[in-house]
Design a protein with these regions (language model features):
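Lipid interaction determinants
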Residues: 2-11, 16-134
Length: 134
């Protein structure tokens, strides 16, 4: 009877610990998620850069004006981003320059961190994205 009681208490404790785990761990890279850059829209636009990372690291970028694809490779907190071809949809020089700077910052990022719904790519410039939860 004592063994049975200990087993029930142990199972109840394990269920409580497992039940309190978050839906995503802070240490998980955001594969399969869409994120939005934490910035204000540029003057005259409502568009904010968005990044969607597939389950295998393939990425779709929708920036201030340009759109394109890329590939993320991740090992622990190290990240490598390789951009693909970008499509220019009649960008103003200012928006094209902002898009190029954003892609370059992703390329230069060496590490990444995640705190809740925020993912940061850290290099010479830190880019902070919010995971879209809706």
């Amino acid at each position: 009877m004592t063994v049975l009681r200990h087993a029930v208490v142990g199972l109840a404790f394990a269920a409580g610990v497992m039940g309190s785990a978050p839906a995503h761990a802070d240490s998980e890279f955001p594969f399969g998620l869409e994120m939005t850059l934490e910035v204000r829209p540029q003057p005259g636009s409502k568009r904010i850069p968005r990044l969607e990372i597939g389950d295998n690291g393939e990425a779709q970028l929708d920036l201030w004006c340009k759109a394109g694809k890329g590939q993320f490779s991740v090992a622990n907190n190290t990240v490598i981003f390789v951009p693909g071809a970008m499509q220019d949809s009649g960008c103003t020089p200012e928006r094209a320059q902002a898009d190029d700077a954003l892609v370059n910052a992703l390329v230069e990022a060496a590490t990444w961190t995640r705190q809740g719904d925020f993912v940061s790519f850290v290099g010479a410039t830190t880019l902070r994205f919010r995971v879209n939860t809706n």
